[in-house]
Curated annotation (Swiss-Prot):
It comes from Prochlorococcus marinus (strain NATL1A). Belongs to the universal ribosomal protein uL16 family. PANTHER family: 50S/60S RIBOSOMAL PROTEIN L16, LARGE RIBOSOMAL SUBUNIT PROTEIN UL16M. GO terms for cellular component: ribonucleoprotein complex; ribosome. Residues 140-161 are annotated as: Disordered. This is Large ribosomal subunit protein uL16.
Length: 161
């Protein structure tokens, strides 16, 4: 299961989930991705269950990238304890997910869109947030990606003047 090796502080406040994801909202590694539509907490167990479901379906065909990491500790108090006497102990780790965040990516030579869609569908069932399947082609058509500027070489600058 995923969890940080060490943290500066053992316990965190719960916080609020407002707005949309401004980082991690574009496909970076593969050709297909699973994008969050809602906000929520995804636990390390849910991430692992989704990863296993996708890996079992794809077998050795392609590669899977996990784009979220559970870095927030969630504390709980023991059952039937009275109020007060401090905050509970960290029980599990969650990743805070906002709408637009890419959760998983998939790619490879042997991965077709139908295989990727089915693998992502199996992963969707394991997650507590509403998600949608997107491909790199759709993202390019939306204008989310700008082509990289070609570097100007010494030969180009001489011919232009």
């Amino acid at each position: 299961m995923l969890s940080p090796k060490r943290t500066k502080f053992r316990k965190q406040q719960r916080g609020r989930m407002r707005g949309v994801a401004t980082r991690g909202n574009k496909i970076a590694f593969g050709q297909f991705a699973l994008q969050a539509q809602d906000c929520g907490w995804v636990t390390s167990r849910q991430i692992e269950a989704s990863r296993r479901a996708m890996t079992r379906y794809v077998k050795r065909g392609g590669q899977i990238w996990i784009r979220i990491f559970p870095d927030k500790p969630v504390t709980m108090r023991p059952a039937e304890t009275r109020m007060g006497s401090g905050k509970g102990n960290p029980e599990f780790w969650v990743a805070v997910v906002k709408p637009g965040r890419i959760l998983f990516e998939m790619g490879g030579d042997e991965i077709t869109e139908t295989i990727a869609k089915e693998a992502m569908r199996l992963a969707q069932y394991k997650l507590p947030v509403k998600t949608k399947f997107i491909s790199l082609d759709e993202d390019l058509n939306k204008g989310n990606y700008k082509p990289a500027k070609t570097p100007v070489t010494a030969d180009d600058s001489e011919s232009s003047s």
